């Protein structure tokens, strides 16, 4: 134990307060089976991010091919540039499916009776850490995807070329790897501004609808509790001093924002209304106290990828804080 400590001296506004050791939490025997399953998925997350970060696209080749439609050599050059990129995009998409299943397994563990979500997070520190790692990955992936228009340009060109060749009764080898059904699913995935967040949101909603005997509050309380965990660690010098690196601080901020966004998509009235169990003002305040260049992307994520920020029920003060 000891990785997740309940804060007995700071019961402020009835929000749960914890310290979660994001750096060292280790699985207990009871957690190990699920932990191993999730770990097998997460071990590929860094290579996915590195591959996405290095993604340059086939813009020049596509442009030359479009401008010179009768030049067969340029058509082939563009096609040969795009095909390996589409295989990479398929890998990213398939990872999202694995992540979806991993999240549902975690939610099952962190919300099941007889324990409350708060008790689960106290007892199952290592699973809580993996949940945080999924959220951290999701925000990083979506940040990179949003900054890279080449992804959709490449895939659109690929689909147009496939359609044109199908009309001419040509079958291309890549169709064995990315068939029409797979291409349709990938197209829907990459059409989203934040595809990984959409995947997590859908996975959470699916989990709620599949577990009708489990109150939705068990799931949303798990999310709001995780937000409080992050917020209290960020605003309390005693806990911040336990982080061994700035990287962990950034991790904690990104997880807090990821959980808020997920909560806002899953909860019927969202994260910003007065009845929300998330202290939105406190969370935004904590972010704004950091170096501006390190949190601008996170503040933008709250501005542009949440669902209920612009609802009438959102207080003017919260909206003003995010302007």
Curated annotation (Swiss-Prot):
MF-aspect GO terms: small GTPase binding
Transmembrane regions listed in the UniProt entry: none
Family (UniProt): Belongs to the CYRI family.
One cellular component term from this protein's GO annotations in UniProt: membrane
Protein name: CYFIP-related Rac1 interactor A
Native source species: Homo sapiens
Membrane topology per record: Lipid-anchor
Oligomer status and interactors: Interacts with RAC1 (GTP-bound form preferentially).
Cystine pairings recorded for this chain: none
Highest classification ranks of the organism: Eukaryota, Metazoa, Chordata, Craniata, Vertebrata
BP-aspect Gene Ontology terms: regulation of actin filament polymerization
Pfam families registered for this protein in UniProt: CYRIA-B_Rac1-bd
Keyword NAD: no
